[in-house]
Amino acid sequence: MFLLAQEKSDTIEFIKSELVQLLSNMRQEIAASRQSQTGAACHHIEYCMDKIQRAKSSVTIALPIESLNLEITTMLRQQLIVLPPEARKNWDQIKKLDFKYCHLK
């Protein structure tokens, strides 16, 4: 009887450790996904800022801003990305430009 109880205890401990490992793996996957998407968003922001700086007319400025605004805002709202300070600063600049040129959309 004692041996049976001991085996059951080992099994419970084993299952607990398996669950802890599974949760740890899930957290790592979520963190990696966020980092990946954050990197992609930062790259996209830089790309659009570059496009905006090279733009020759305000119409060409408004179009990438509108596209970027929808994408980034959606990802931020769903907490898929966390913008680092530099990207946040660039994003704020883009949002100001978006407001400035919103009549062209």
Predicted regions and their residues:
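Short terminal alpha-helical segments
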Residues: 1-41, 93-105
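Generic signature of intrinsically disordered, low-complexity, basic-rich segments
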Residues: 1, 7, 51, 69-70, ...
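Amphipathic alpha-helical interaction modules
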Residues: 22-74
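Amphipathic alpha-helical binding modules
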Residues: 66-105
